[in-house]
């Protein structure tokens, strides 16, 4: 099964799309059960294909560089 965080973001995204489609009238004739099935199927499909990963942040310590110049 997919990662929990990936599944959460997939559910969130698919839920937002279904809300937009239902408020604009594209899902007027659909029953609540068919909308719920659409929601679950698309969210699980997206979560199984796409894996959410945290971005890797690499912190390199800044080292001061000194140049030695001989004057004379």
From Swiss-Prot:
Segment forming the signal sequence: none
Statement: the UniProt record of this protein carries the keyword Glycosyltransferase: no
Localization in the cell: Host membrane
Record carries keyword Transmembrane: yes
Primary site of residence: host cell
Coiled-coil stretches: none
Transmembrane segments: 7-27, 32-52
Name by which UniProt lists this protein: Putative transmembrane protein ORF72
Species of origin: Acidianus bottle-shaped virus (isolate Italy/Pozzuoli) (ABV)
């Amino acid at each position: 099964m997919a990662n929990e965080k990936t599944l959460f973001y997939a559910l969130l995204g698919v839920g937002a799309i279904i809300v937009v489609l239902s408020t604009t009238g594209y899902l007027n004739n659909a029953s609540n059960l068919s909308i719920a099935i659409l929601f679950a199927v698309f969210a699980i499909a997206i979560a199984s294909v796409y894996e959410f990963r945290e971005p890797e942040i690499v912190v390199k310590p800044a080292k001061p560089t000194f140049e030695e110049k001989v004057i004379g």
